Amino acid sequence: MKPSIHSLAHQTMQEWVLEQGEKKFRADQIWEWLYRKRVQSFEEMTNLSKDLIAKLNDQFVVNPLKQRIVQESADGTVKYLFELPDGMLIETVLMCQHYGLSVCVTTQVGCNIGCTFCASGLIKKQRDLNNGEIVAQIMLVQKYFDERGQDERVSHIVVMGIGEPFDNYNNVLNFFRTINDDKGMAIGARHITVSTSGLAHKIRDFADEGVQVNLAVSLHAPNNELRSSIMKINRAFPIEKLFAAIEYYIETTNRGVTFEYIMLNEVNDGVEQALELTELLKNIKKLSYVNLIPYNPVSEHDQYSRSPKERVLAFYDTLKKKGVNCVVRQEHGTDIDAACGQLRSNTMKRDRQKAVSAVNP
């Protein structure tokens, strides 16, 4: 399979055109066609020679993803199911926010973190996405608006889709550099957020990178016993090790951290847990922010249910009274397969059922 042209950083593109016997400025032209004019084929790059277009076609593809399903919500949320060149499926979500268009990208096919409440982990990790496959998700969402003649542009990115981004560290970093490049989509680093389930050593590495991308940590519980019961990653990186890495990140970057906390009815949503959480955050309270997330039920995880509004409000009020910055996340796409991984999982089930029916009519 030929790689996506989006896999090449700008400098790598310059090196490639020089290897082809071309002038270095050709790299700028190619990038302008890809990221500013957003063409879908090399033939549309009309200021390139036929010989260079042939070389591009011989070595790369523009778009490695095939659109399988698009679900549009009444609130403007759009969920995409894309097929990779090897036939595997991934999800991408567009959310219309008051501050702009935000896209949630996937970084792996499946997930090995194994959170007991999450649809993403229903299918184990099969492979990492490469940089080009992650970039292509942004480009295809942008194409959705371009084709409708809507003068809107993707302005924010959250790396919170299927997979653990820091388990695909190098590809995710290269994605940041490509999408942030002034000659490309030029999406500001501070408009990008990456979420990790808590790979402590990678949080330290990320602190040392010096990038301005925002960090979010999927916490979901304030103590080791509870967190280990719902997130097996906590057995490898218990809260003490995780928070040592978070404090290192804050000290190194002087940047805040968002903590994601999914509200599971009578599991982690009591006032007692809220008080534990305030204690856990006491040393970093000024540079921490808690995002309380209403739970999207997953049929395979029917041991969990959504916290009632009164329990969410009591938890929220407890945090606020203790001086913790927090918010209840606005929901998007509740009338479609909203939970991360749900559309992919449901589609794979239907595909399997069709295959069985074809064999046993």
From Swiss-Prot:
- Which GO terms of the cellular component aspect does the record hold? cytoplasm
Example GO molecular function? tRNA (adenine(37)-C2)-methyltransferase activity
Q: Report which reactions are catalysed by this protein.
A: adenosine(2503) in 23S rRNA + 2 reduced [2Fe-2S]-[ferredoxin] + 2 S-adenosyl-L-methionine = 2-methyladenosine(2503) in 23S rRNA + 5'-deoxyadenosine + L-methionine + 2 oxidized [2Fe-2S]-[ferredoxin] + S-adenosyl-L-homocysteine; adenosine(37) in tRNA + 2 reduced [2Fe-2S]-[ferredoxin] + 2 S-adenosyl-L-methionine = 2-methyladenosine(37) in tRNA + 5'-deoxyadenosine + L-methionine + 2 oxidized [2Fe-2S]-[ferredoxin] + S-adenosyl-L-homocysteine
The Radical SAM core domain, residue ranges: 97-329
Q: Name one GO biological process term.
A: tRNA methylation
Q: Which UniProt keywords apply?
A: 4Fe-4S, Cytoplasm, Disulfide bond, Iron, Iron-sulfur, Metal-binding, Methyltransferase, rRNA processing, S-adenosyl-L-methionine, Transferase, tRNA processing
Q: Which domain of life is it from?
A: Bacteria
Q: What is its EC number?
A: 2.1.1.192
* Cofactor(s) in the UniProt record: [4Fe-4S] cluster
Cofactor binding comment, as recorded: Binds 1 [4Fe-4S] cluster. The cluster is coordinated with 3 cysteines and an exchangeable S-adenosyl-L-methionine.
The record places the active site at 91 (proton acceptor), 340 (s-methylcysteine intermediate)
Cystine pairings recorded for this chain: 104-340
Q: Quote the subcellular location field of this record.
A: Cytoplasm
Chain segments annotated as coiled-coil in the UniProt record: none
In this chain, [4Fe-4S] cluster is annotated as bound at 111, 115, 118
Residues the entry annotates as binding S-adenosyl-L-methionine: 163-164, 195, 218-220, 296
- Keyword 4Fe-4S listed? The answer is yes
Leftover remarks = Reaction proceeds by a ping-pong mechanism involving intermediate methylation of a conserved cysteine residue.
PANTHER family (alphabetical): 23S RRNA METHYLTRANSFERASE (PTHR30544), RADICAL SAM CORE DOMAIN-CONTAINING PROTEIN (PTHR30544:SF5)
Q: What does this protein do?
A: Specifically methylates position 2 of adenine 2503 in 23S rRNA and position 2 of adenine 37 in tRNAs.
In its UniProt entry, what is this protein called? Probable dual-specificity RNA methyltransferase RlmN
The protein's organism comes out as: Streptococcus pneumoniae (strain 70585)
Write the lineage as a comma-separated list: Bacteria, Bacillati, Bacillota, Bacilli, Lactobacillales
The UniProt gene name for this protein comes to: rlmN
